[in-house]
Amino acid sequence: MLRLTRPLFRQALKSSTGITGLAVHPNPLPELIKTYESTLSALSTIPQSSVYRQGVEALTRHKLSIVKGVNGDIQQAETQLKEGQIEESLDIASDELSLVAKMAEWKAWEPLEDKPEPGQWEYPGTATPSS
């Protein structure tokens, strides 16, 4: 019984994150799981060949497995996620979910409409000789 209530008790003692504008979440782990699952669902609208989708999907699946594997221990989740406090992880996950929607809207995987000028992506001192 005590093992189950310990994380809740520890969280109840936390009155502030110490970060301006970031409130303590009353039940962060289920919300984090829901956000990660929503992100994975939203990624299905982006082609599998997209590098963005591949990267975000791998990272989100990894984070989701961590959160599901800690069995409600917020402290352990914070340690394994390495993103600071759990509220910060929740904020990062929410931002990524918003970005997935924007990337789908922008169709970032499609080729550029206007082809770049020759040398546009070359930095000074790295230019290749012209043919």
Range-by-range predicted roles:
Residues 25-57:
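Amphipathic, heptad-repeat alpha-helical segments
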Residues 56-66:
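Amphipathic alpha-helical segments that form the core helices of the histone-fold
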